[in-house]
């Protein structure tokens, strides 16, 4: 699972995912990429599930780049606790994904294999996505 080694603060402010991404919008490393069409928080478990789906379909051939990282801790208060008395404890780690962010990239496999692997990864994520080719963003 992806999570930061250490953070300056345990409980950060919430980062909004509305609007378009400023960076990380082009396929830089691989030949094909998975680009988000919506904004959302993507948990480290969802990122890992998408990675496993891709690598298993590609049978460990080729290379997969994960272009997002879960930096933000999402907090939650325990059940049946009254309002107030501070912020809840960190529950999970999420990556903030805005519209147009390239989340995954693939290289080193045939085009059909890459497209199917990215399609499988798409179904593991809570955002609408599209598959883009390098240079055709």
UniProtKB/Swiss-Prot annotation:
GO terms for molecular function: rRNA binding; structural constituent of ribosome; tRNA binding. One of its GO terms (cellular component) is cytosolic large ribosomal subunit. Signal peptide: none annotated. It comes from the Bacteria. One of its GO terms (biological process) is translation. The keyword Ion transport does not apply. Keywords: Ribonucleoprotein, Ribosomal protein, RNA-binding, rRNA-binding, tRNA-binding. Pfam families: Ribosomal_L16. PROSITE patterns: RIBOSOMAL_L16_1, RIBOSOMAL_L16_2. HAMAP family: Ribosomal_uL16 (MF_01342). Part of the 50S ribosomal subunit. Belongs to the universal ribosomal protein uL16 family. Binds 23S rRNA and is also seen to make contacts with the A and possibly P site tRNAs. This is Large ribosomal subunit protein uL16.
């Amino acid at each position: 699972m992806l999570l930061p080694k250490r953070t300056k603060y345990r409980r950060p402010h919430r980062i909004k995912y509305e609007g378009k991404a400023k960076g990380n919008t082009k396929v830089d490393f691989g030949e094909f990429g998975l680009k988000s069409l919506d904004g959302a928080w993507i948990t480290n478990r969802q990122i890992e599930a998408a990675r496993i789906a891709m690598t298993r379909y590609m049978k460990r051939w080729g290379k997969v780049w994960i272009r997002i990282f879960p930096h933000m801790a999402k907090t939650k208060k325990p059940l049946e606790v009254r309002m107030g008395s501070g912020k809840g404890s960190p529950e999970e780690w999420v990556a903030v994904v805005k519209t147009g962010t390239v989340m995954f990239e693939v290289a080193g496999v045939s085009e059909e294999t890459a497209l199917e692997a990215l399609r499988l990864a798409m179904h593991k994520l809570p955002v609408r996505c599209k598959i883009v080719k390098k240079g055709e963003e």
